[in-house]
Amino acid sequence: MEHSTEILYNKTEVYCSAVHRFGSDALLLARFAEPKRLQRAADLCSGCGIVSLEWHDRGHRGPCIGLELQPEGSALLSAAVEEQDIGHLTPVCADLRTFRQGEGSFDVCACNPPYFTDGPQSQNAAHALARHENTCTLDDVCRCAFRLLKDGGRLSLCHRPERLAEVLAVL
């Protein structure tokens, strides 16, 4: 698979494609939601895995999953994990609406979910899935996180300010 490589501060490599790339919002989310060194963490809607790879770059070594629906995004994370021998990070290509592994065992979940419910969509199906709630709604993300999190666990989201009331209502 053809990809470009972005190098994080401590030399962790992130593999990106034209569809699966990242912006500053994902890096801010990773820093905000950063798990403690050995906590169990989940990066939901992981795309190329930037959040979980940033956690690794900053010293997280606990069990971590990068859960992504789109095979290309999951494959990019898998390649980065394999080539850099990041054994504690497990890419998972699955639908978060039906994902059940590790229920009630995670300390931290983070998600940079699709932002838009309506409006013009990209002609590229992968772009549309990443940006619009076609197959993954805010409610779906929260339901998955609350299945995965143990008591006292925390969910961190990055979302648009105009949807703050909806985010709070769903939580």
Describe the function of each predicted region.
Residues 20-24, 135, 158:
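Short, conserved micro-motifs enriched in small and acidic residues
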